[in-house]
Amino acid sequence: MNNTIQEVSVDLHDWRDEQEAWNNRSKFFVELHNRADRKAQVTDFLSFLKDEYLLPPDGGTALDIGCGVGDYALGLAREGYKTTGIDLSDGMIHGAKQLADKEGFDVNLYIAPWSEETRQRLGWDKTFDLVYSIFCPIMFDVDNIRAMHNASYDTCLWIAFSERKDETVDMLSEHFFGRDSFPWASKVKACLDAIHEIGHNVKVTYKTVPETEVMSLDKAVDYFTMRLHNNGWGIMEDMKREIRQLIEPRAIDGEIHNKTVDTVAWVSWSVK
């Protein structure tokens, strides 16, 4: 095995708080890796690539932008592809290395925020057969979509939320930070406009995914704190106590039932 980690020499000054926030979530995502629902998501991803003829040629290369702990990169590695992952969070990247080492697959790993500067610094000019990004917040920036396109030799896949409804997170987020004003529709439209401008054979598929998450009160407190806490808010334990007070009245027999409905855009295109 040759699971290397390289920290890219780019300025992280403006990214430190976000990096730490994702680092604090990395343990959760390592534990999520072997859960049945995560395995099903990876299987669905691979099936989509196969059905849409997006898989690299045998032994080909793939880049995962915002790879997290490498769930999807490892899924491709199991199929015999040479995979690379890049993520802002060093905690996530070290989690990816831990999982890759355990499973016996090679994944090249890089720590950096994705940008055109990062792409150029790494010399990734039409380097990978497939470049993809899954639920990576930074990819709502059109310039980062263009950088993704420039890193690909053949095809790209961008998977992103176009609408999110999360009963408990929405309530807690409004309590702590005010009503969510993220312009999902306009952000997705701007990215789609850019993709139609630069790409060929663009295909957009929307999937609506309803789900009810059931967890104990203690696990729910930890989970929603992990989802919401950032350094700008304050002390994590203070948020935990407040979250417990807010969600405990919603518990049914000691469990929290959280209903979510996500609308997800699967956008594929060819670069040539």
Where are these regions (language model features)?
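Class I SAM-dependent methyltransferase SAM/SAH-binding core
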Residues: 71-117
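Short alpha-helix
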Residues: 184-199
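A short glycine-rich, Lys/Arg-flanked "PGG" loop and its adjoining helix->strand segment in the class I
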Residues: 142-157
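A short SAM/SAH-binding and catalytic strip from SAM-dependent methyltransferases
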Residues: 128-143
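Conserved Class I S-adenosyl-L-methionine
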Residues: 203-272
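Conserved class I S-adenosyl-L-methionine
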Residues: 1-57, 59-68, 157-182
